[in-house]
Amino acid sequence: MKQYLDLCQRIVDQGTWVENERTGKRCLTVINADLTYDVANNQFPLVTTRKSFWKAAVAELLGYIRGYDNAEDFRKLGTKTWDANANLNEAWLNNPFRKGEDDMGRVYGVQGRSWAKPDGGHIDQLRKIVDDLTRDVDDRGEILNFYNPGEFHIGCLRPCMYSHHFSLLGDTLYLNSTQRSCDVPLGLNFNMVQVYVFLAIMAQITGKKPGQAYHKIVNAHIYEDQLAPMRDIQLKREPLKAATFHINPEIKSLEDLETWVTLDDFWVEGYEHHDPIQYPFSV
C-alpha cells in the first residue's frame, strides 16, 4: 500500500503535464515506476484508502486467461470493464473490423491464447508456459505477450499491461509484468491485484511456490479531472491493515480456469477500507 501511495504522491509533486491525443485530456505524468508484491507471504496489494472492487479485477484476468474477445463474456464473469472500450470508443465504432455490439477485437487474451502466425495457424502462448512450468522447465522465455503491432487495427485498444514473464528458481515461481501506460487512480488499483493474482494462480496450477511479482510501469499518470480527488481526498487518508487473498485449492489446472472456475473460487479476508471515490474514466 505504501508503494502505491508513494507513486501517487510522486506524480502529484513531480509530474509533468502531457496532452493525451486519444482522450483529449491532459495527464500529470512521470516515467518509470517499479512495484513489488510479496505473493510468498500473502501481502495482498489491495488499496485501502478507498474501496477497491477486487472481484472485477480478478474477473478481467480470468477473461484474459480464457482468451475472451467480447465484453458480454466479461460481464458474465463479473466485470463491466470492457463495456466502454468495446461500445463507446468512437474510433472502434467506425472500424470496419468491428463485428458488432460488445466486440473487442484481437486484444489481450486473444493474443495470449491465439497469436496469429505469419505462415498460418496460431500460437497458444499461455498453454506453452503452463506446460513448461509444470515440467519444471524455464527456457528464459516463458513470456506471455499481448503486444502485437501487426493487429492493432483489429482491436479496440492497445494493451496497457502487455507482458508477463514467468521465471523459475528451484521450485519457486516469479513474475515480471510490464505496463506501458497506467491510469494510476483507476487502473493501477486493478493492475496490482491482477499481477499478484496471476502469479498466485499460475504457481498453484503448475505445482510451484509463489515468490515475488515485479511490476514495471513506464508511463504513470493522473488525468486532469482525477487530480483533485487524488490530492485532496485519497492522499489525505490513512492506509489501513492489509487484507489476505485466497484461492480455491481445488483449482489445479489451466483447464479448470477455462471451464468451471468463477469468482466464488476467490475470496479476500480482513479487507478494511475508506469510502469509495468516483474517479472519472477516460475512453
Swiss-Prot record:
Enzyme Commission number(s) from the entry: 2.1.1.45
Residues that coordinate or bind dUMP: R22, R180, S181, C182, D183, N191, H221, I222, Y223
Alphabetical UniProt keywords: Cytoplasm, Methyltransferase, Nucleotide biosynthesis, Transferase
Region forming the signal peptide: none
Catalytic residue positions: C160
Xref: InterPro entries: Thymidate_synth/dCMP_Mease, Thymidate_synth/dCMP_Mease_dom, Thymidate_synth/dCMP_Mease_sf, Thymidylate_synthase, Thymidylate_synthase_AS
Enzyme class, broadest EC rank: transferase
Listed CDD domains: TS_Pyrimidine_HMase (cd00351)
UniProt-listed GO biological process terms: dTMP biosynthetic process; dTTP biosynthetic process; methylation
Pathway the protein acts in: Pyrimidine metabolism; dTTP biosynthesis
Subcellular location: Cytoplasm
Annotated catalysed reactions: dUMP + (6R)-5,10-methylene-5,6,7,8-tetrahydrofolate = 7,8-dihydrofolate + dTMP
GO cellular component terms listed in the entry, alphabetical order: cytosol
Major subcellular site: cytoplasm
Alphabetized Pfam families for the sequence: Thymidylat_synt
A single MF term (Gene Ontology): thymidylate synthase activity
Assigned protein family: Belongs to the thymidylate synthase family. Bacterial-type ThyA subfamily.
HAMAP family listed in its UniProt record: Thymidy_synth_bact
Function: Catalyzes the reductive methylation of 2'-deoxyuridine-5'-monophosphate (dUMP) to 2'-deoxythymidine-5'-monophosphate (dTMP) while utilizing 5,10-methylenetetrahydrofolate (mTHF) as the methyl donor and reductant in the reaction, yielding dihydrofolate (DHF) as a by-product. This enzymatic reaction provides an intracellular de novo source of dTMP, an essential precursor for DNA biosynthesis.
Subunit description: Homodimer.
The protein's name in its UniProt record: Thymidylate synthase
Originating species: Vibrio campbellii (strain ATCC BAA-1116)
